[in-house]
Amino acid sequence: MKKENQAALILEGGGNRGVFTAGVLDYLMEQNTEFSYVTGVSAGACNAVDFVSKQRGRTRQCMILEDKEYSYISMGNMIKNRSLFDMDMLFDRYPNEIFPFDFDTYFQSNTECELVVTNCNTGEAEYLSEKEDRQKLMNICRASSSLPVVSPMVELDGEMYLDGGIADSIPVIHAMKKGYRKNVVILTRNYGYRKEKPGKSKALYVAAFREYPNLLNTLLNRYRNYNRTLDLIEKWEKEGHIFVIRPEMEPVGRAERDEEKLAAFYQHGYDLMKEKITDMETYLKQDNED
């Protein structure tokens, strides 16, 4: 089914590189820009729910912390909870206490929002949505953001899940299969970036996931799938079929904690979207062609 007059927003992950996406989305929220469909992966899932709940500035607050007491990245946490990131802080204390998430606005939104997770048994991507249960929504976000090896698996309805980026890092093809003809893609890497074949990480994956052969296969081939998707994105972008926003400065690292670097990358996203808003609006208004 074609959705001629509707547009999709696709958000890549990348840990704290998601602060770039936060800048892009904060500007879009200032302009009251809405999309019929939003999908996000890993950190992009967190961006996605904040966009649908219309909480301008929330993702920035979560990523650029003024109070170090609420930091969610530490090696101590890796030893204590087998996770580099404090997932309880991120998906329990943040939304319920520290940076309250507006569940009511999110649940009442007409925007369809799907968050990408990877099923550990099948090794395939699943696209989950939740518009009623607060805890389940945050658990889906947690699963979508749970990196292999450095985060434990997350159980949802009896199945085990990990980071959505393992199986589908940039779900633009999924959005197209759902019928969306206008797709705005927010990437967190520069033009021309490609992933390399697993090196030392291969041994870690084999040791950690030998009981999950389908997941292991997806992990070892992730670079191929990711690079193939980027090849298509660059082709479709050149042909005018999709609209892409990506960093034009050096991205920060996945676990970057330097406030100045994070703030600069956030501002870059904001300024870039402001610069390109007219081009995006023109793209969205263009007639669709078969």
What are these regions (language model features)?
Residues 1-41, 49-290:
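Patatin-like phospholipase
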